[in-house]
Amino acid sequence: MQVHLIHIEMIKTVVIGGSFAGMTAAMELKRKGKEKHEVVLIDKSPLFLFIPSLIWVPFRRRELKDISFKKEAVLKKRGVDFVLAEAISVDTKLNVVTTDKGDFHYDHLVIATGPKVQFDIAPGVAEYSHYIGTPNGAMKLRSALEEFVKNPGPIVIGATQNAGCMGAAYEFLFNVEKWLRDQKVRKKVDLYWVTPEDYLGHFGIDGMPMGEAMLKGFMRMFNIHYRTQVAIKEVTADSVILSTGEVLKSSLTQLMPPFIGVDFVRNSSSLPSTPNGYIPVEDSYRHKEIANVWAAGIAVQVDLPFECKNIPYSTPKTGYPSDETGKVVAENIFRISQGRTDLKEKPWGKIPGLCVMDAGKKEVLIFSNSLFRPRVFALMLPNVIYDFTKVFIEKYFLWKSKHGYSWLP
């Protein structure tokens, strides 16, 4: 009896980056493609980190172990190969990714690399201001706050010119204000908020109904001084110098610098990218020039639908849209493997706005049918009782991610 072996040509997709967008894209593609798809995720960190909860780490409300887990076991369970390596560059003509652990060939490439933080945006930002956006930065802030309380002074919190992640800085501001009251030193501290935004509550999304009025009310209620439409000229050991010439004394400074594209993109001469290192994509998240290259999450170039008045700033790229773009990419690679040409499209600005801004055991719920205007509905709802929703979203997303339930919202 003759036995005929049927050879099934597997499609290999390499995903660079293992945070919200990368994890979702990899697991969703494997779930849809099953044995016909080989999916490899390359990341330099063994841990998945729920970044939105970093704002609680300086205040000991969370430890890093509470908001992170090893990703390899989850990926393996879902059939995704994990490679702990740093991606160095890609040759899109040869379809080869070079890492510090060797080269990887691909049929499709998904770039979900997250950001590089531009600390050199102004003199002194790297040396004298803190940054809440990394585990190391959050732990340094914890140490700085514990020293600060021994000899309180003015605090400056905010965002630099070109920044897009204003929301996390707002959250840190209100958490610091609550912490100062808990430490019984609030009356000894002048608290300043500085932002390039045209107005309070712009958030890089052109604002929300009643948002400016609400935040102005918070600033009055908590006695926080604020400056809008300002850039950072320089940060020193004990001051922040604004573009207006004003000098704010500061014993502790926390600023959100801009995000730019990672070195992997900049090192890849055959990969067309924008001047700031992001990937130009169609509404399907396929590269505008290279048919088998895709991008998801922060790596995506998002064009601003508004003009900044005086100081340039950007738009936020948060976990929910990153997760959504990862799903779109997975669906489209799967469709192409099926011979389909009808790609799913979901422009970044049309992704629903779903955000909870923590305000020091209080919260503001932000909902809209799309991130950018025009919107059918948009709502900012304060919850002054407790930050139930923020905690629930953290617990839900960690549960979902630890189990690899990538198809869930």
Locate each region found by the language model.
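FAD-binding core/adjacent interface of flavoenzyme oxidoreductases
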Residues: 3-12, 79-171, 178-184, 254
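Beta1-alpha1 glycine-rich phosphate/pyrophosphate-binding loop at the start
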Residues: 8-81, 161-205
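Glycine-rich, N-terminal phosphate-binding loop of Rossmann-like dinucleotide-binding domains
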Residues: 18, 101, 113-114, 244, ...
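A Rossmann-like FAD-binding core segment of flavoenzymes
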Residues: 38, 77-89, 97, 177-279, ...
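FAD-site-proximal beta/loop scaffold in flavoenzymes
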Residues: 126-151, 249-252, 256-322
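Rossmann-like dinucleotide-binding core of oxidoreductases
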Residues: 150-217, 225-227, 316-353
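C-terminal, flexible cofactor-proximal segment of oxidoreductases
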Residues: 328-409
